[in-house]
Amino acid sequence: MKVSVLITLAVLGVMFVWASAAELEERGSDHRDSPAWLKSMERIFQSEERECRKMFGGCSVHSDCCAHLGCKPTLKYCAWDGTFGK
């Protein structure tokens, strides 16, 4: 009984190592290509609107913050103003 449990655990360990190595090899090729992919995605999502401060960015007036964000008067940072929509 003990031997069969040990053999089962050893087989599961070998399968885990084999699967991890295969996943690492597969992800490794994607990892080399990812910086170019990320740069292309950055260009796609760049806003054509005016530059605005994102969440928790510093601000002095409400118009400094992006849509649906408002400038908090005490600590001067952009936070959600409680609105939804476009």
Curated annotation (Swiss-Prot):
Record's signal peptide: 1-21
Disulfide bonds: C52-C66, C59-C71, C65-C78
Propeptide: 22-50
Coiled-coil ranges from the UniProt annotation: none
Gene Ontology CC entries for this record: extracellular region
Presence of keyword Thylakoid: no
Recorded superkingdom: Eukaryota
Keyword presence, Protease: no
GO terms assigned for molecular function: ion channel inhibitor activity; toxin activity
One Pfam family recorded for the sequence: Toxin_12
Primary role: Probable ion channel inhibitor.
Record family assignment: Belongs to the neurotoxin 10 (Hwtx-1) family. 28 (Jztx-11) subfamily.
Domain topic, free-text comment: The presence of a 'disulfide through disulfide knot' structurally defines this protein as a knottin.
Protein's UniProt name: Kappa-theraphotoxin-Cg1c
Organism: Chilobrachys guangxiensis (Chinese earth tiger tarantula)
